Regions:
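C-terminal binding/interaction regions
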Residues: 2-48, 97-168
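Short, well-ordered amphipathic alpha-helical segments that serve as non-catalytic structural scaffolds
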Residues: 41-44, 86-94
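Short Gly/Pro-enriched turn/cap motifs at secondary-structure boundaries
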Residues: 50-53
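Short beta-strand scaffold segments in enzyme catalytic cores
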Residues: 55-64
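Histidine- and/or cysteine-centered catalytic micro-motif in compact active-site loops
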Residues: 63-65, 74-75
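Compact, glycine-rich, soluble single-domain proteins
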Residues: 73-88
Length: 168
């Protein structure tokens, strides 16, 4: 079985968003070039949004700790409660392409303007990026610990993930 090529960096491109093997990254390593790649992927994803009801497309992009960039778009449904935010699509792609931890995140609307994740999506991003995940917001970049202070997370549940896995 062959592994699919990495996702494109822009709607008109089929080239991967990186040219070399992915290398581990941390929040301190984020350059303006990295943020530009995230913005390009978010815009590419936004162009694929399914929004027949609101006509409000959203695209999201995240940098994974191994150097991959994953993206997602919002997908509406006539039963509004089952509409998927772009962040949900992004986390699905994260797991479909090998998992990992999110290091940086960007989100745009149909005009390419920066959006802040809703509360539900902040919680979702916290689960897969932790307090150090850097979020791009209209007011600037901030770690998740600032964007979602004193958040409920896995540490609040009984047992650690490794203890939970050992029980099953």
């Amino acid at each position: 079985m062959t592994v699919p090529e990495p996702r494109a960096s822009a709607p008109e491109s089929t080239a991967p968003v990186w040219s070399e093997e992915p290398t581990p990254v941390c929040p301190e390593d984020l350059s303006e070039g990295t943020w530009e790649l995230l913005r390009a992927e978010a815009k590419r994803a936004m162009a694929r949004a399914y929004v027949p009801y609101s006509n409000y497309p959203v695209g999201a992009a995240g940098l994974v700790d191994d150097g991959r960039i994953v993206g997602g778009c919002n997908i509406e449904n006539a039963s509004f409660g089952v509409t998927l935010c772009a962040e949900c699509s992004l986390v699905s792609e994260l797991f479909m392409t090998g998992g990992g931890r999110l290091v940086a995140f960007d989100c745009v609307d149909g005009e390419g303007k920066t959006l802040v994740p809703c509360g539900r999506c902040r919680q979702l991003l916290l689960e897969h990026g932790g307090n150090d995940l850097v979020i791009n917001m209209p007011s600037g970049r901030a770690p998740m610990s600032v964007v979602l202070p004193e958040a409920f997370g896995p540490d609040h549940l009984a047992g650690t993930p490794s203890e939970h896995e050992a029980k099953h």
